[in-house]
């Protein structure tokens, strides 16, 4: 396939900009559903990162530790999704979203870029879960 045909098949929204970790600011925490909705509302593609929780579920967060975005220590791979949902909130008060919640929110409205975050060699389990 020629380069021109490949480019022609790409969604034009991909070229308008990609909101890194959503379209966030001092009132919307990065990688939160409200930051992703803000990107969607502005017709921007967005990028996010996913980690594998202890129970095999996928959580959206850039860092492997929840401290920077929640203010509370916690290694994602050592916690279950239930523990995270019960005990952690993003700095703006929002829940830390799961991969499934991000997919449901976007519902194919804009293109997304997802980075799989490997922790201590868990790449096979992470790839299977994703």
Residue ranges and their predicted role:
Residues 1-130:
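Phosphate-group recognition and catalysis centered on beta-loop-alpha active-site segments
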